[in-house]
Amino acid sequence: MGSRKDFETLIPDKIRKKLRNDGVPFSELRQASKTPENLIEAIYRYWRGGNIRIERNWNGIPAEAKNVSYSNSACLLPDDRIYLENSTFRDLWKAATWNVNSIRTRLPLLLEWLEEQNPDVVCLQETKVEDAQFPAWELRQAGYESVCYGQKSYNGVAILSKHPIKDVQLGFHNCYDQDNARLIAATVSGVRLVNVYIPQGQTTESDKFKYKLTFIEELIQEILAENFSDSPLAIMGDFNIAPKAEDVSNPEAMQNKVSFHPEEHALLAKLTDFGLCDLFRKFDPRSGQFSWWDFRTQGFERGEGMRIDFILANTVLTSSCQACIIDTEARQQDRPSDHAPVIGEFKL
């Protein structure tokens, strides 16, 4: 993954100043670059990280002022004007959720991803580490304070933030499931965050499936206790449930299986019935957009996975959401998690 430093090494100082102030046409940027053959990819990666603004220009005729979204940086036009911004892209507040599947194993990837994406707050699941061994110092060096609720080798949740973390809660209000570190809540920038790692459930015949259903029932009560009607609230994390047919690669084969079972769907629907919105689906209705792929079957390479990681937001927060994506590039890196981050951008 690229970073701000990678991008800026391609740009002469005098051009960098223009990028921040007046913007630079892509053609001029390309001519001034020390290594123009690397520029397009660097622009794309830095744009994904949220610190480049691009205004479309058709042969010198500016289009309406707007930010250009594109999935392939090769479509940049010569007259497109590029701005390098000090603040987060469009001054938006960026929140992410990511099941890292062991924070100690994934720490180099996480630190690189934080530098590239520059999120304001991140909810992590499956940190798999006791609190004393949580890499708080390394994260602080990267600009993030953290609160964690962990245990040895299993489960574990944490919240990372560039802003003060307030009103931290470890576990459920009613002390349910105290032996498992699966829920942490806090307030950041006035937004109440509930970070949850719902049990996988194993098989529908097992006690672990009953535990999963009970856990979701308790989560519903926990959300009701938050009394969130007038202030922004996000429930973020690994839900281990694919809501609909478009969220799995083979819905027929998944029928009545764990993570795609009617009882799970009914409980998940109770959350949305409270007025919580699945933010990814607010912006992207396409099928085949997954956040988890099985290592054992090479699911990522085969395009076979499930969308089981969500940002659910109440009406107040949903109204401020400008975008929500699944960052599949993080899944393509060396030693990745089996999950990809889900990122939401908000105009608070």
Show where each model-derived region lies.
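Residue-level detector of structured alpha->beta connecting loops
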Residues: N118, G143, P164, G275-L276
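Metal-dependent phosphoester-hydrolase catalytic domains
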Residues: R81, D131, R140, V168-C175, ...
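Active-site beta-strand/loop signature of hydrolases that rely on acidic residues for catalysis
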Residues: A95-N99, L114-A132, L193, I223-A245, ...
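N-terminal, active-site-proximal structural segment of metallo-dependent hydrolase catalytic domains
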Residues: R4, R16, S71-E145, K152-V157, ...
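A long, amphipathic alpha-helix that forms part
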Residues: F209-D230
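Structured beta-strand-rich core segments of catalytic domains in phosphoester-bond hydrolases
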Residues: T127-E130, F134-T203
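Surface-exposed cleft-lining segments at the edges of enzyme active sites
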Residues: H173-N174, P199-I216, E252-K257
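Basic helix-extension-helix modules of the SAP/HeH family
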Residues: M1-N67, C75
